[in-house]
A protein has these predicted regions:
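N-terminal auxiliary interaction/assembly segments of multi-subunit proteins
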Residues: 1-168
């Protein structure tokens, strides 16, 4: 999975530069809001689109760019993230967990929006969408314009993905 030449030309960023922005945004959100320090393991060695016992938070982009930023993590890690973020114990998939993962995806979307758009005025964000399940697949219709960054916190791994398209 990588970004096409068209997307890189439109954004004026290389894939590595966009990946660095996503990595920096993820580390910033996690250090300030979750009090966790994720280590990136970029680049992703093998494409992942099937998730088991996981939760996915997504925010869409619309405007001069369209696309999605997403975070995919195992439920056990999502419960730790939620507990740290909200300062309360979370031991099941519930509204608090969905809200926390949705808010993290929203903050990541806001960070990327600022990079892609001068002042963020020509790119809008959707409301976060959260999916959780025992076994599900997430597919993009534009895998050729996708950057996925693996992260690790202790022994837990999660992914942050950015799918991007320049609108005409």
């Amino acid at each position: 999975m990588s970004l096409s030449a068209d997307v890189m030309a439109a954004t004026k960023f290389s894939e590595e530069q966009l990946a660095k922005y996503v990595i920096d945004a993820t580390k910033e959100v996690f250090s300030t809001m979750v009090m966790m320090d994720p280590a990136d393991e970029y680049p992703l060695q093998e494409a992942v689109n099937r998730f088991k016992c996981s939760i996915t938070g997504m925010v869409g982009f619309a405007g001069i760019y369209s696309g999605v930023i997403s975070i995919h993590c195992p439920v056990n890690l999502a419960m730790k993230i939620t507990s740290n973020m909200l300062g309360l114990e979370c031991d099941e998939v519930n509204e608090d967990l969905n809200d926390a993962i949705g808010e993290i995806s929203n903050m990541l979307g806001g960070s990327v929006k600022q990079v892609l758009s001068k002042g963020g005025l020509d790119v809008k964000l959707s409301i976060p969408t959260v999916i959780a399940g025992e076994d599900y697949t997430v597919n993009s219709l534009s895998d050729s314009d996708c950057v996925v960054i693996p992260f690790k916190i202790d022994d837990d791994k999660f992914l942050v993905g950015l799918v991007l398209k320049k609108e005409d």
